[in-house]
Amino acid sequence: MEPGQPREPQEPREPGPGAETAAAPVWEEAKIFYDNLAPKKKPKSPKPQNAVTIAVSSRALFRMDEEQQIYTEQGVEEYVRYQLEHENEPFSPGPAFPFVKALEAVNRRLRELYPDSEDVFDIVLMTNNHAQVGVRLINSINHYDLFIERFCMTGGNSPICYLKAYHTNLYLSADAEKVREAIDEGIAAATIFSPSRDVVVSQSQLRVAFDGDAVLFSDESERIVKAHGLDRFFEHEKAHENKPLAQGPLKGFLEALGRLQKKFYSKGLRLECPIRTYLVTARSAASSGARALKTLRSWGLETDEALFLAGAPKGPLLEKIRPHIFFDDQMFHVAGAQEMGTVAAHVPYGVAQTPRRTAPAKQAPSAQ
């Protein structure tokens, strides 16, 4: 062809063999890349009456020790000012944080199996914080990618009166007095404590451990021990082995967990269920264990594991279980669990509690 002479038009070539096959992975990779860039759609909040509602205070969900000190020593105005100045700094995770993350992991599994079901966990932030502090709380929740859409910020007033309106199945707080108020209102509640050291817990299975007497069951048997001693207690339990114990404050929460477990069982996933429950009791198996198990059976409930310690410390066993939370009515069991790295929660119910004074000692208010 001479220089400057126009080229003759050429017909398009047919793609060679294997060209489509070679291009397919490229397009698949590009699709995955752009899908990941798209904002992920958040799940829809369930109706409160259909969900298992867990209400947590801000000091249970996040560590707010420094802020609480400012509130106590310098007052509410300085506290709010400090929160506003630091509202873009997320709080550190608090003792209830791993528990909440585990609840959300269960929700993801439930939504995979039952996309339209509202029978899931619904987490509510229940706090007496001022609404101005809400921005920092929201920023912290978004920072950790938590799905908490329901807030109740009462501006210094007790939030306990709102718990029933939110259909609360369990209330966790760092404020012991508010927990006692909730228990008195018939709501399952516990004061949550940070462990003395951090322990890695399961990211895929929610593990919840319960004491028996005065937690799942009433304090009937503990009253016998306190009044008449262990020998009389063993006689009493043997004589009443086939009489179910009355329910304790957290029976309803175990029932709610069992309801969600059955949704996995019905899909043939009993062994792969992302919820596992434990009964961890100081009872002896041979002398007083049968009544505890028969009581659960009479309620149509069960725990995945039942551990009878016959008075031995609970901390070492809990260290092996690594639950996200352990509920007990006696503070020395709570302290023993803390020492072994377990997040423990005190249920202030029953005869084991320190008698209240008629004129309680004045406590500094807390910013929950």
From Swiss-Prot:
Its EC number is 3.1.3.5, 3.1.3.89, 3.1.3.99. The active site is at D211. One of its GO terms (biological process) is adenosine metabolic process. It is found in: Cytoplasm. Its cofactor is Mg(2+). Activated by ADP. This is Cytosolic 5'-nucleotidase 1A. It comes from the Eukaryota. It catalyses: a ribonucleoside 5'-phosphate + H2O = a ribonucleoside + phosphate; a 2'-deoxyribonucleoside 5'-phosphate + H2O = a 2'-deoxyribonucleoside + phosphate; IMP + H2O = inosine + phosphate; AMP + H2O = adenosine + phosphate. Catalyzes the hydrolysis of ribonucleotide and deoxyribonucleotide monophosphates, releasing inorganic phosphate and the corresponding nucleoside. AMP is the major substrate but can also hydrolyze dCMP and IMP. Keywords: Cytoplasm, Hydrolase, Magnesium, Nucleotide metabolism, Nucleotide-binding. One of its GO terms (molecular function) is 5'-nucleotidase activity.
